[in-house]
């Protein structure tokens, strides 16, 4: 009996979508001033590198952002809805308790019959989702997977908390992963430390028709910084070792776009020149699960990320969760 050929998951296309409303730091400072909260463009840029963010208008949902990003990724990959046999949406801000956002996207796209489900790992979500899709493709359980990171974090922010409300934006990014005979995703690592839940969480819930707990995002910024740079450094080295490459071999580092301080510190630890780090946090702010696919799409479309190059994508977020995906484009 002939042995079945090994299949790999390769990125065939990408797409991104940002809400039309752009809010600059000056815009945000003016809005917060009406609440007697003081901030400024200088204060925000110095601490985060963020200059603006896109915010969804009231009534715009995560599934709508995800659907538009998905359509753009499908166009880029040249695939039709009937070719998609798996949809995974990474989000912490779903439209509903259920059905899943992925099922809503599937209906919007006119895709039918394939698996559709959500993954919730906060800002690590896209890396978790892509690793999951990669496993299905390698196992022969899927051939064309749509992997989406989409968030409307503006709905869970406490706009009276200057330390968090300036950090986040809304958006969606997507990739199409297709089965291929040559390696695309070379290695992937996922991790979590559930003992660190309180450093970044939104601990609200809906029970018996009422919101219980605190529905807003809360973060210990210093603890998150310390954890993030430590685990991402180790994860990058581990995933490269598994793939048999050196960190120096990486053409592009695309980390979760939390803030520029984390990005720069991580680049220094890994000894990756900043010119080989894709940075979009200045324009998008922190879009949680959407940040990595959005950054990848920007870098592919502006010509920085090219076919054949080695790209390391990393996520880190609440849970505490983190992970890395190393891919040949």
Curated annotation (Swiss-Prot):
Q: List the disulfide bonds.
A: none
* Pfam name, any one: ACP_syn_III_C
Q: What is its EC number?
A: 2.3.1.180
Coiled-coil features, chain-numbered ranges: none
* Alphabetical keyword list: Acyltransferase, Cytoplasm, Fatty acid biosynthesis, Fatty acid metabolism, Lipid biosynthesis, Lipid metabolism, Multifunctional enzyme, Transferase
Which pathway, metabolic or otherwise, does it act in?
Lipid metabolism; fatty acid biosynthesis
The answer to whether the entry has keyword Amino-acid biosynthesis is: no
Give the region (ACP-binding) as residue ranges. 257-261
Q: Report the domain of life of the source organism.
A: Bacteria
Give any Gene Ontology cellular component. Answer: cytoplasm
Q: A GO molecular function for this record?
A: 3-oxoacyl-[acyl-carrier-protein] synthase activity
Q: Which top EC class is named for this enzyme in its record?
A: transferase
What's said on domains? The last Arg residue of the ACP-binding site is essential for the weak association between ACP/AcpP and FabH.
Q: What is this protein called?
A: Beta-ketoacyl-[acyl-carrier-protein] synthase III
Which organism is this protein's natural source? Bordetella bronchiseptica (strain ATCC BAA-588 / NCTC 13252 / RB50) (Alcaligenes bronchisepticus)
């Amino acid at each position: 009996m002939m042995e079945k050929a090994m299949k790999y998951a390769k990125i065939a296309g990408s797409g991104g979508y940002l809400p039309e409303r752009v809010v600059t730091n000056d815009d945000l400072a003016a809005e917060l001033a009406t609440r007697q909260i003081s901030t400024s463009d200088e204060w925000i840029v110095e601490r985060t590198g963020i200059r603006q963010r896109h915010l969804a208008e009231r009534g715009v949902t995560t599934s709508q952002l995800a659907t538009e990003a998905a359509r753009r990724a499908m166009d880029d990959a040249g695939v039709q809805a009937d070719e998609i046999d798996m949809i995974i949406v990474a989000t912490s801000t779903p439209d509903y308790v259920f059905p899943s956002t992925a099922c809503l996207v599937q209906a919007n796209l006119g895709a039918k019959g394939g698996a559709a489900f959500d993954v919730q790992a906060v800002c690590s979500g896209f890396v978790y989702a892509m690793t999951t899709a990669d496993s299905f493709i390698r196992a022969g359980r899927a051939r064309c997977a749509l992997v989406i990171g989409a968030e409307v974090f503006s709905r869970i922010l406490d706009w009276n908390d200057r330390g968090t409300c300036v950090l986040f934006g809304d958006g969606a990014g997507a990739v199409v992963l297709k089965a291929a005979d040559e390696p695309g995703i070379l290695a992937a690592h996922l991790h979590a430390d559930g003992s660190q839940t309180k450093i970044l969480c939104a601990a609200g819930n809906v029970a018996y028709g009422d919101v219980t707990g605190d529905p807003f995002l809360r973060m210990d910024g210093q603890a998150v910084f310390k954890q993030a740079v430590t685990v991402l450094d180790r994860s990058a080295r581990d995933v490269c070792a598994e793939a048999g490459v050196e960190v120096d071999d990486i053409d592009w580092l695309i980390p979760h776009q939390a803030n520029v301080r984390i990005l720069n510190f991580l680049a220094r630890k890994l000894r990756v020149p900043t010119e080989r780090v894709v940075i979009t946090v200045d324009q998008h702010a922190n879009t949680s699960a959407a940040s990595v696919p959005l950054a990848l799409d920007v870098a592919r479309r502006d010509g920085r990320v090219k076919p054949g190059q080695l790209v390391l994508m990393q996520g880190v977020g609440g849970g505490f969760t983190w992970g890395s995906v190393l891919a040949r484009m």
